[in-house]
Structure formats: structure tokens, C-alpha cells
Amino acid sequence: MGCFESKPSEQHQPTAVRGCTDIFWLVVYILFWIALLVIAVFSFVYGNPLRVINGYDSFGNTCGVSSNEKFSHFPLSGMNTKDKPYVFFLDIKELRQTLKICVKECPKKEIGNAMELYRYYEERDTKYCRYDFNMSLLTAPDASGPKYFAFAGPCPKFPVYESSSVLHRCIPSGKNAPTKVVKDMYALVNSFGAAQQVFSDIYKTWPTVLLLVGLSLIFSIILIMMLHWLTAIISWLICIFVAVASIGITAVLWWSYYKQKHSIDTDTKLSYLEELVRNETTIYVLAILATCIMIILLVVIYYLREKLSGLAALFEEAGKCMLQIPGLAGPPVLAFIALAVFLSFWMVVIVCLATANYPNVKPLLPFTQLKENPNKTEAAIKPDMSVNNNTYKSFDLVEYPEADFLRHMLWIYIIGLVWTSEFIFACQQLVISGAVAYWYFRKPTDTPVLNAIAKLVKYHLGSVAKGSFIITLFKIPRLILTYLYAKLKRHQQEGSECASCCLKCCICSFWLLEKFIRYLNHNAYTVIAIESVNFCPAAKIAWNALVTNALQVATINGIGDLVLFLGKLAVAALCGLISILMLRDNPDVHFYMAPVIIITLFSFFVAHIVLSLYEMVVDTLFLCVCEDRTINGNSGRWKQSNLAHLLGESPEQDAVEAPMQVVELTPITKQPFSVQSLQMTEIDDKGAV
């Protein structure tokens, strides 16, 4: 039995009018997105990346911004700190309790007394006292007393050491700075959440991220053009390009690791900052992974060299289809725009969630817990009962504790990233499948791509949501297990080898299941586009077709898809290589591997969208050829196709194409199916659900 059987019928009965599929899953997907939007609103209210990147003073002002929120009872809040991007601590020995202010620059030299502080203010127009303090008071004879220079301000305690900016915080860097003080300052910076630091670096590099993701689209389009015009040698070119790119990115990673390690070993103070140490560790791990992947790719390319010549016919046939349907270039562009908009939205929300905090009152002096003397007659001086005694105990400042209730929403957005990305990919796949199937069976004069898009929006969004959710269902557990395995490996103890082995097995199992389901989904979308059935019945039909033609499937999707996958890797590797060269010397970014990883992943997504065009065209043509061969035998259109090679036949270029069949066809589901059903989709949708 072939892909489809023909079944004679006494009278022609076309299939039912196309109706909506998997409506329940469309409702679930819409509700999920409503939840994402609600979380996004809260993240925009509470999140402020600049508050983490630049820091804030003790009055609630974020440093380096033009407008700040004004709080009642805090007259120094709501200030314009655009020209004051750095945080300065008035007493570096009491970092948790001292007053913080925003300053124009960190001290360029050591300041030892009040007059030197005033001269520095006159020379460099940089004020290291509280905003409302009159600096001319420092010239008074009694200015050197403790009333002006304390951890509560209004001016800093001496000496003020020469400092440099680390994450926009002034940290002593002069030779006279005590080691303990420097360590305490770095410990304070390290106390910021790792997620905050990572997403802060991503926020600072967003123009570079957008630039290189856009560049990945250009690289992918160039690769598509090469697939069309250089079919005879494109397989070799892709393999050579992948080999060069993998070697290049591996060499750059090892060189970056050497430079990072050398700089940390040379300057011991740099080792106090966990971001730089984390950067070194990440580069080291990525360099090892890149080396392993490079070796695997070179071995695979070496063994594929004898089979690459057979792919010319495959890509030539796909190129012929795309040449006759120029509209096929539209779905990848639309998918890229949709993915770019979603990823931009996702990045903004995820950064706001990671930096979410809320204003709170903090007492500066820890004397509010002290009780008043109950026997006031024993006091030498009677207290003034008209004054609130709490004013002598403390005065309040503003701090921003983390909004933990929003931090947990990060997991929902991680699920949303996978599900929505897969949803966009699935929409593209179904549109391409429908357009190619209509072109193969009907050869219409109108635009099959627009027709396929219309049918997707009207009827099949539910099936797309279900198919993408199934992929998510297997991918999320694999990501969680991979994370657990990394933590177990980092803190590996004696006796954990068994757990490590089990995790590896589970990760591999979920990876294999995900790849299998993803491949089955590709073909299920083709059946949905043709027959308008729900996702599960369509997957069953596609599975039967694949099993029946297992040898041909292995040939087409084994070698062809592998070469296309190498092309996606090449685009991602090239963009990752460029991002490393652009970001590794950026002084404002400490954990630069975070944006590098984001750029590489997003570039792979973009390349996957564009290059999956060829993949879907080939898969769809294969299913159509299987049906055509079963229905028409050697007189069908497939006999003139280069795909006949892949079906074990010789193409007949001069064969006369048989007319389109008008008899009822019965697919392997044993349910009636007719070519006429394709024509019925043009009928008014009055019978649709």
C-alpha cells in the first residue's frame, strides 16, 4: 500500500465544507496570552532596569535618569540625576547603613579634609555632600568637626579614597585603599541577584542584539538564494562554511578565555567581582562545548562528503516549486517580523520581571527599637513633650526591596517563550504546506499562499496551538532536567554518579521525543492543510504515510535536513562570533557572554524560520508525490520530478502529464478524500463551524 489508496466510487461526493479544528486549544492559548499580558502590566509597573544598572540613592532617586518619582515626606526625591550616573557612599565602612548619593563622577584623587573636599567641588563641579548641603559651610573654621562628616552625612567621612566605577558604583581603587574595604564594596555589588546582573547587561546591549539578529536574517536570505542558484555545489559550500565558522568561534572563545583569565590573574582586585569570575567560567565552559561540537561537525561532514552530490536534485526540485510560487518567500518574512516583535516584547518583560522592586521606608539609624526611660523624674533634663521623640531615634530613607511575587512569574514567561515561538514556527509551516499542496494538485492561477494564510486564520489556529503545545510539553522538562544536571555537576558529590546518569538518560529521551514529535508535526500540518481534520487524526495520517515510505523518508529528511540544520548552525555561529568580537572589550558590560548567548539563540531562531522554508517544501512535496504515485502510477506528475530519484525511480523528462483526477480518493485513514475538496475550499464558508 502506498501513501494513499484510490477507491472507486459510483458518484462523486466531495468532502465536507472546511471547518474549524481544535477550537478548545485555541481558547486555551488565548487565555494563556491574557495571563502573559496581565503579568507584563505588573512588570512594567514594578520593574526598572536602570535602577539596577545605575543604582539609586537613599532618597529613591535612580542615578543617571532625567525624571524620578516624587515621594511625600522625602523632599530630596524626584530629582533630575541625568548628570549624576554614579552611586557614592558617604561612609565606605558602613555600606549597609550609610547615606548614598548620586554623583557626577567618582573621586579621581584622595581627599583628606574639608578644604580639599571644597576645592575638589570648585575645580570639578562634583559635589560629594548631600544635595541640599551648602558647600560654602566647609570653609568655616569649625567645619572639620563630626557634625558634617558622618555615615549619616551630610558629607563623607575622611579619607575619601580615589575610586573607579564598577557597575556604576564608586569603589576605591587607589593604592591607599584598605583591602578589607575594597572586598566589602565588591561583596555589596556581588549581593545583587545574578539574574538582575545578567538581564542588566542584556538591557545595556539591546541595540547590538537587534543589529545582529537583523544581520542573521540577511545571512539566512543569502543562504536561501545560494540554495536556489547554486544547487550543484551548495551542499559543499554549507559544509565548508560550517567547518570554518565552528573553527573560528572555537578559536575566539579560547582566546577570550585566555585574555579574561590573564586580566583577573594580573589584577587581583578584579577577582573580587563575581561577574568577571562568572564570565571567565562561562567562556571556559562554552569553549569546551564549542570544541566538542566542532569535532563532531568535522567528523559528520567528513562522512557526508560522498552523499552530498545527491542533494542537488532535492534542492533543485524545491527551488523549482519556489520559483513558480514566489509568494512562498512571504511566510518566512511574516514569521520573522512576528518573532522579532514577540522576542522584543519578551525581553522587555523578562528584564522588568528580573528587576522588579517596590519603594519601601528604611530607618537610617538603628535606634528605633530603644524604649524611652519610664522614670522621667530621674532624667537630668526634662524632654520637650511637644516634639516627637522618634525624631531623635532615626530618620527614614527610601529603599527598593525585591518584588519576589513577580520573580516567580519568570517561569511562566519561559513557557511562553517556547510555546509562542513554536506557535509562530507552526503557523509558517502550515501556510507553506498548504500553499505547496494546492500548487501541486491544482496548479492554480491565483495566489496559493494568501489562500493558505486565510484558511489558517479562519480554521486552523487551534491545531497550530495544540501542535506547538505538544512540542513545549517535551521541551520544558528537558530544559529543567538540563538545568538540574548542570547544578548537580557543579556540586557533584560522591554517590551522585547514578543520579547524574539518570538525568542524562532522561534528557536524551526527551530530546529524541521532541525531535520525533517536531518532525511528525511538519507532516501533520500538511494533512491539516489538505483535509481540514483535527491535529491528532492528521498526525495519524502522516505517521502512516511515513511508515509506508520509511526508506524514502530517511533519505530525504536524513541528509537534506541535516545539511539545512548545518546551515542554521552556520548562521548562528557567525552571529555569535561577531557578537563576541563586538562586546568583549565593552567596558560597560561585565558578563558579556549573556548577550552573546541571547544573540546566538535568537539568530538560530531566525535562521530556522527562513531555512525551514526549504525543509517544509521538501516534506510537503514528498507527501504529495506519494499520493500522486499511488493514484496515477507512472503517469503522474511525480514521474517528471527529480524526486523520482529519491523514490527509487528514474525521472521521465519527456513524459506527458496526466490530467488531474476527478475520481474520489481514499487516503490511508479510510475516509473519503477527493481532489474536489481542494476546490470546495473556495465555496462560501456558510457551513463552517
UniProtKB/Swiss-Prot annotation:
Ranges in a coiled coil: none
Localization per record: Membrane
A Gene Ontology term for the protein's cellular component: membrane
KW Transmembrane (keyword) present: yes
Report keywords, A-Z: Glycoprotein, Membrane, Transmembrane, Transmembrane helix
Q: Which residues cross the membrane?
A: 23-43, 199-219, 233-255, 283-303, 333-353, 412-432, 461-481, 562-582, 591-611
Q: Which protein family is it in?
A: Belongs to the CTL (choline transporter-like) family.
- In Swiss-Prot or TrEMBL terms, this protein is called Choline transporter-like 1
Annotated glycan sites: N134, N279, N375, N389
Q: Report if keyword Transport is assigned.
A: no
Q: What is the protein's membrane topology class?
A: Multi-pass membrane protein
Any one GO MF term held by the record is: transmembrane transporter activity
